[in-house]
């Protein structure tokens, strides 16, 4: 059924400042993105400002050619998303075909013609919402989530709705989206930190990478720079999809603020380069955007990515030069769809390599001058103590930090805490992390205690989740000394086993 948008898109949501091309007549108006979205909004009952926000997240309101992201197996950029509305066709998803069926337009028209693409996107979104359309913008959140392959996409769209957006397209059309009062759910409030402390862990589909135990001393010697050819959230969602069996990357950097998501552990091999010898010894970093649209290359993204590359270069002893920090184009051969030379140009001619490498070098010098980190495992000699109440357990050794853990069968009414001895070389601010193997019979309200310069403080964690990774416990001011200052409490208001496995401190 037809359903008029609640808000007049052309009046309240978008201001068209300049017409397309040199003429300002009817032909120019017919080709404006604002008009195309207005018509699609009216035809399918989808709020126009929602279409506009989605288009901004997808492509910054550009219409990339189909070749920009045609599906290719083993290629993290070739996810098969098309047009300003990022309609998808790959082995696990086909919103492009769905759009064709709903609108009666051919797949080729939707891939190549912007108005058809906008119409197809609106039709799919309306179909996902069901016959009874939501009565406000917040009500469309679930449909947007399903459209984009997960809640991360919806969150990115709704952040744009809340903040507003403005841009001039390559055709000269100026579009402005006014801020809206919408609710942006806080996703993953207890999300695990990635291997890189400034990243967030999102995970992978399980069949799109190679499990390994690469050693920092010798197994990683290259960093490969990529472009997503799509939005940040679409890349993260694709890498996390259980139906994706072909491609992944270790990290993905967001354009707007430099936020970093991790999809594959550094110790494992991501399928990002399309050339096994490169994959085997490299870390792949994706960057949100398109190779031919330099507006995506923000200062925030450059600086955040350079900080990450500097961290990796120091950690893995990677030389900071263009032989070891390379573009996807430099990867040898085209053995698969994801190969480099002759197959890819990313990050493309607009990527400022001089700026990027200078930032990496500057940050690496700072890291080398200020880096301090200590990891203490429950098996570290002279640095862990616990009463006989804590049993040595070799359960879940594949996701414990070391060969075992200490387990308290049930919380006690008295303090018999397990304690880790931590050395801090100078008074200052330190990040503290905990590690444990998770299990459903573990305690959901385990208490960590950290001794700061102001006394003992507590942090409660759920040990039923987030196992086998470093979990951020907070940043604290610690005194200069070497003492038992991080504990796992023997007391807990919850039920279940309490685990003491490993802790880590890092200078902030």
Residue ranges and their predicted role:
Residues 28-163:
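Catalytic glycan-binding domains that act on GlcNAc-containing polysaccharides
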């Amino acid at each position: 059924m037809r359903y008029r948008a609640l808000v007049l898109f052309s009046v309240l949501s978008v201001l068209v400042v300049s017409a397309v091309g040199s003429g300002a007549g009817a032909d120019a108006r017919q080709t404006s993105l604002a008009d195309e979205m207005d018509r699609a909004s009216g035809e399918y009952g989808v709020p126009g400002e929602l279409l506009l926000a989605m288009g901004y997240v997808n492509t910054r309101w550009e219409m990339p050619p189909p070749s920009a992201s045609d599906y290719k197996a083993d290629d993290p950029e070739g996810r098969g998303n098309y047009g300003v509305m990022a309609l998808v066709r790959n082995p696990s998803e086909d919103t492009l075909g769905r759009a064709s069926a709903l609108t009666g337009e051919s797949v080729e028209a939707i891939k190549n013609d912007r108005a058809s693409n906008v119409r197809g996107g609106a039709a799919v979104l309306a179909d996902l919402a069901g016959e009874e359309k939501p009565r406000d913008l917040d009500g469309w959140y679930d449909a947007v989530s399903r459209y984009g392959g997960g809640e991360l996409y919806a969150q990115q769209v709704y952040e744009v709705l809340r903040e507003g957006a403005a841009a001039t397209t390559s055709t000269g059309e100026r579009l402005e989206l006014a801020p809206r009062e919408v609710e942006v759910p806080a996703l993953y409030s207890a999300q695990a930190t990635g291997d890189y402390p400034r990243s967030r862990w999102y995970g992978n589909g399980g069949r799109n990478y190679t499990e390994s135990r690469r050693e920092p001393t010798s197994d990683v010697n290259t960093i490969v720079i990529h472009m997503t050819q799509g939005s940040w959230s679409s890349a993260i969602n694709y890498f996390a999809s259980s139906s994706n069996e072909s491609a992944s990357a270790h990290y993905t950097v967001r354009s707007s603020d430099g936020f970093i998501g991790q999809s594959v552990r550094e110790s494992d091999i991501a399928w990002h380069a399309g050339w096994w010898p490169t994959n085997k010894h490299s870390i792949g970093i994706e960057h949100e955007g398109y190779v031919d649209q330099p507006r995506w290359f923000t200062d925030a993204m450059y600086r955040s990515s350079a900080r990450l590359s500097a961290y990796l270069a120091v950690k893995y002893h990677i030389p900071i030069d263009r032989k070891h920090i390379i573009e996807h184009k430099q990867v040898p051969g085209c053995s698969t769809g994801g190969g480099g030379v002759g197959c890819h140009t990313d990050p493309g001619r607009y990527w400022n390599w001089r700026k990027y490498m200078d930032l990496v070098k500057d940050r690496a010098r700072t890291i080398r001058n200020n880096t301090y980190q200590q990891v203490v495992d429950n098996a570290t000699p002279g640095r862990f103590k616990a009463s006989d109440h804590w049993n040595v357990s070799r359960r879940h050794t594949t996701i414990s930090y070391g060969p075992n853990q200490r387990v308290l069968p049930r919380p006690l009414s008295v303090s018999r805490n397990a304690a880790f001895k931590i050395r801090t070389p100078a008074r200052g601010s330190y990040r503290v992390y905990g590690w444990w193997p998770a299990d459903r019979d573990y305690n959901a309200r385990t208490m960590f205690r950290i001794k700061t310069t102001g006394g003992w403080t507590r942090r409660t964690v759920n040990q039923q989740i987030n196992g086998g990774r470093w979990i951020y416990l907070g940043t604290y001011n610690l005194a200069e000394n070497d003492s038992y200052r991080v504990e796992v409490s023997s007391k807990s208001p919850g039920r279940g086993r309490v685990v003491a496995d490993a802790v880590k401190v890092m200078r902030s």
